Curated annotation (Swiss-Prot):
Main location: nucleus
Record annotation: effect of changing residue 874 to T: In strain: cv. Cro-1, cv. Sakata and cv. Sha
SMART domains for this protein: HOX
Tissue: Expressed in shoot apex, root apex, leaf primordia and floral buds.
Organism from which the protein derives: Arabidopsis thaliana
Effect of residue 858 to S: In strain: cv. Kn-0, cv. Lz-0, cv. Par-2 and cv. Pon
Residue spans of biased composition, Polar residues class: 414-425, 733-742, 888-934, 942-953
Ranges for region 5 X 5 AA repeats of Q-P-V-N-G: 498-538
UniProt-annotated location(s): Nucleus
Protein name per its UniProtKB record: Homeobox protein LUMINIDEPENDENS
Complexes and interactors: Interacts with SUF4.
Length: 953
């Protein structure tokens, strides 16, 4: 409420308003000071005045554009001012040169000159207004007008724009002011309109400023009486508006231009004289391409409106003129026919005299309807002063009659009247256009005569348009007809029609026809002399008035048609065939297209993709849910999705080779160790299994070497110590006792995964964590844990079962024993299964040799790759890729070797014996690679596994 009271107090008194203005002034000055501080600070920081261009533009009185680059540089401004001091208009070439010289656009150069000219004219106009105001004050004080040459128009209104009788108001030197005659004032107008009529022209001629012109045009817009506006047009008001329009366009006064166009749209210009319309049309037509779109669009719309209006008015005038002419002709013929009927029908001379008068009248009508040339009318003196008349007016005024060239014979068709007029939107025809039209018409006539070979082949027959309509000639008309026989040779003689027994016959005649009334229907008979009207046993003849349409549009005489048909009937067949060949049409058969069977494309109904697409569509079921809460997160689940899918069935096939950590040993030592390992594995397989205690003692003294050999990582031992230990391994390799048995048991086989689960309970997937890295140091430490006899027994059963599964495929002799042993061990495994859950760590150790893939044993000694573990299901089909010799060796030493190992392990509870041959890196794969090298080469083409692992070896 307090704020509302303060607002009321501010606007309630003058003092409050002054206080408000003072406060706004203080705020404005404070903002200016802040802007000045910002500019000064920016100038100190950057060293450049940010308002330099604006200040220069203000000093030079240049209009600032929207962007800084729109401003002219000082050099360009100085040069343009020097050029403007010499001349105020430059050409396009000079504008381009200045633009290229100073780096400005041509539009900027043109705008500079236009702006400077506008400023100069404004100064001149202001000085004139001061003189006019001083003269007005002097006239009011003294009562005598002062004449000054400076008050004259720069572009005075043409004197011929005003009729002498229009008004006597003067605006030049030495003339006096007079009132408009009362007879020129339109009757029945209001007082305001009367005041407008009395004073408008005096004010229009005296006004020189655009502001005063705007006020006067607004006064014209307020007049709604059509008679007053027509009077304004008749007295020359359009020419004054035209002068103002040209001045406003030259000085780019857009507001004045728009108002003048509105006034022109308000005035009934269809009542204006042609000379006034010519002047205003030229001025408005120049505004069609004005640079401001609003003005150009208004000018185009105004011209279009005038074009339609004038075309409509001219059509109405033409129709009225034709109707009035037809009415006068019909009245004249009616009077003559009535006079003939009322006269004495027995006197033929009177009838002939009447017919003679009628023929003369008809000839007058025909001459009036003939071709219209550029005839001089009553107001031709005013038309000669037209600069450019209305297009529709020119269309009615300019008509061309074809003139036959001297020495040129008449063509096949008589020269007809050709009316060529400009269209409603084209310019008036010039003399060149008329001459071109004549030459074109003559060319077309000669071309048409060449295209018609039939008259030349026939001979005398020609098709000539009639020059005169049907008329009745008397005996007095015969001398002129006989005198003009040479001129009317080619004129067709009208045929006569005589109905006989109800049918009409067509007969040619040799002269003008005569009409004779007979008993019955009207008969027209040919005569060989001048026509005569004779009553024959019947009533007096009745002259039927000829209609104007029949005069204007004479029908084609039937004689030409009948004669042409008769001549063609008399022609021989060869002549007709010759004429037909001249007009023969060449027919061309379009090229055909034959379809090749190879282009056929099946519809795809029996394609394999149809079933795939059908199944794909079945997966997309349309489901309707009752509410938003019932919609699942992913409703587009396949309908045949497998429940509880086992990912272990999917084999893990690496896309690239696993990274390897190379040892610091030289390549020669690696090759040497490979050869030694191959020899050791070969000798160990042939010798009896005995443990190498010396090697075991050496390895137990160096646990780092054990870790390096098992994990594939380099140890901290020196190179010499490493070589010594390797020499011990070479010498002790043949004495190893249990390596051959474990090689068979620990061999790792890689093949495609089996889709069926294994029946071995030891491979039920308990030790997945241990399978991931079977040769880690953690697992090696775990081997020292004490194991009970039951655990060892369970482990031995698992090993027996695994070996028994690989033997029967290649050793039929041991088939029954292996089946019995496998069945017994399966029953014991079911009994011992609860205890195996408590010994998970030991079970992981037993599964290590089984789940190890071939990727971990690429190097024989000293380097172990980072093996990738696969599921136990992927090991079921691996035994099928090995030869019969391996399985026979394994079956011979399988039971005894593993029993010896189990006894050795049970004799040392808590510890596990270790030898190089029993090492995970020295498994059966190395020996198998040397023994079965030939078989691998032989089976490489059939087994994709060897083709795949060539790059791993």
């Amino acid at each position: 409420m307090d704020a509302f009271k303060e607002e009321i107090e501010i606007g309630s008194s003058v003092e409050s308003l002054m206080e408000l203005l003072d406060s706004q002034k203080v705020l404005f000055h404070s903002q200016i000071d802040q802007l000045q501080d910002v500019v000064v600070a920016q100038c100190k920081l950057t060293g450049v005045n940010p308002l330099a261009q604006e200040m220069a533009a203000g000093a030079l009185s240049i209009k600032i554009g929207k962007r800084p680059r729109d401003l002219l540089n000082p050099k360009a401004v100085k040069y343009l001012q020097a050029v403007f001091a010499i001349k105020d208009a430059i050409s396009k070439r000079e504008s381009r040169e200045i633009s290229a010289l100073f780096g400005i656009t041509v539009a900027q150069v043109r705008e500079f000159f236009v702006t400077q000219k506008t400023r100069v004219r404004k100064q001149v106009r202001l000085s004139r207004e001061k003189v006019v105001m001083s003269n007005t004050h002097a006239l009011q004080d003294d009562g005598v007008p002062e004449n000054n040459n400076a008050t004259n128009h720069v572009e005075p209104v043409p004197l011929n724009s005003i009729h002498p009788e229009a008004c006597s108001i003067s605006w030049g030197e030495g003339e006096t002011v007079a009132l408009i005659p009362p007879e020129d004032i339109p009757p029945d107008i209001s007082d305001s309109d009367k005041y407008f009529v009395e004073n408008i022209f005096s004010l229009l001629r005296k006004e020189e400023t655009f502001s005063g012109q705007v006020k006067l045009m607004e006064w014209i817009m307020q007049i709604q009486d059509a008679s007053v506006l027509i009077w304004f047009l008749s007295k020359g008001g359009v020419l004054i508006l035209t002068t103002w329009l040209s001045q406003a366009a030259s000085e780019e006064q857009t507001s004045v231009l728009l108002l003048i166009l509105k006034v022109l749209c308000h005035l009934p210009l269809h009542k204006a004289s042609p000379e006034n319309m010519s002047a205003i049309l030229q001025s408005v037509n120049g505004l069609r391409f004005y640079r401001i779109s609003d003005i150009s669009n208004r000018a185009k719309g105004l011209l279009s409106r005038w074009t339609k209006l004038f075309a409509k008015i001219q059509a109405m005038k033409k129709q009225n003129r034709n109707s009035s002419q037809i009415d006068s002709q019909s009245q004249l013929l009616l009077k003559q026919s009535i006079a003939e009927i009322m006269g004495d029908s027995s006197n033929p001379e009177d009838i002939l005299s009447l017919s003679n008068g009628k023929s003369e009248n008809v000839r007058r009508i025909e001459s009036s309807q003939g071709p219209k040339l550029l005839l001089t009318s009553a107001d031709d003196s005013t038309k000669k002063h037209m600069l450019g008349s209305n297009p529709s007016y020119n269309k009615e005024r300019r008509k061309v009659q074809m003139v036959e060239q001297p020495g040129q014979k008449a063509a096949g068709k008589s020269p007809q009247t050709v009316r060529i007029g400009t269209s409603g939107r084209s310019r008036p025809m010039s003399a060149d256009d008329i001459q071109k039209a004549k030459m074109r018409a003559l060319y077309m006539q000669s071309k048409n005569s060449k295209k018609d070979p039939l008259p030349s082949a026939i001979g005398d027959s020609k098709i000539v348009a009639p020059e005169k309509p049907l008329a009745l000639h008397s005996a007095k008309d015969s001398p002129p007809i006989q005198n003009n026989e040479a001129k009317t040779e080619d004129t067709p003689v009208l045929s006569t029609v005589q109905p006989v027994n109800g049918f009409s016959t067509i007969q040619p005649v040799n002269g003008p026809s005569a009409v004779q009334p007979v008993n019955g229907p009207l008969a027209v008979q040919p005569v060989n002399g001048p026509s005569a009207l004779q009553p024959v046993n019947g009533p007096s003849a009745v002259i039927v008035p000829v209609q104007a349409d029949e005069i204007k549009k004479p029908s084609t005489p039937p004689k030409s048609i009948s004669s042409k048909v008769g001549v063609m009937m008399k022609m021989s067949s060869q002549t007709i065939l010759k004429n037909c060949k001249r007009k023969q049409i060449d027919w061309h058969v379009p090229p055909g297209m034959e379809l090749d069977e190879l282009w056929r494309v099946a519809a795809g109904g029996n394609s394999k993709e149809a079933d795939v697409q059908r199944n794909r569509n079945r997966r997309e079921r349309e489901t309707t849910y009752q509410s938003l809460q019932t919609i699942p997160l992913n409703p587009k689940e396949p309908w045949d999705r497998e429940m509880d899918y086992d990912d272990s069935l999917t084999p893990e096939i690496p896309s690239q080779q696993p990274p390897e950590e190379s040892l610091t040993e030289p390549q020669d030592s690696l090759d040497e160790r490979r050869i030694a390992a191959g020899a050791a594995t070969t000798s160990s397989s042939l010798s009896s299994p005995e443990p190498d205690l010396e090697l075991l003692a050496a390895l137990l003294k160096n646990p780092d070497l054990v870790y390096a050999l098992t994990s594939g990582k380099p140890s901290n031992l020196a190179g010499q110590d490493m070589v010594k230990l390797l020499d011990v391994i070479k010498t002790g390799a043949p004495n190893s006792s249990s390596s051959s048995n474990k090689q068979v048991e620990e061999r790792v086989e890689v093949s495609l995964p089996s889709p069926t689960p294994s029946t071995n309970p030891g491979m039920s997937g308990w030790g997945q964590e241990g399978i991931r890295n079977p040769f880690s140091r953690q697992n090696q430490v775990g081997t020292a844990v004490a194991r009970s006899g039951t655990q060892l027994r369970v482990g031995s059963m698992q090993w027996h079962q695994t070996n028994e599964q690989s033997i029967p495929r290649h050793a039929p002799s041991a088939y029954s024993n292996s089946i019995t042993l496998a069945h017994t061990e399966r029953e014991q495994q079911q009994y011992m299964q609860p205890k195996l859950h408590h010994n998970l760590h030991f079970q992981q150790q037993q599964q290590q040799p089984i789940s190890t893939t071939s990727y971990a044993v690429r190097e024989p000694v000293g380097q172990m790759g980072t093996g990738t573990s696969s599921s136990w299901r992927s090991q079921q089909s691996q035994n099928s890729y090995y030869s019969h010799q391996e399985n026979e060796i394994a079956s011979a030493s399988q039971v005894t070797s593993y029993q010896g190992n189990s006894q050795y392990m049970s004799s040392n509870p808590g510890y596990e014996s270790w030898s190089p041959d029993n090492s995970p890196s020295r498994n059966q794969l190395n020996m198998r690679g040397q023994q079965q090298q030939a078989s691998r080469k032989h089976d490489s083409s059939t087994h994709p596994y060897w083709n795949q692992n060539k790059r791993w070896r």
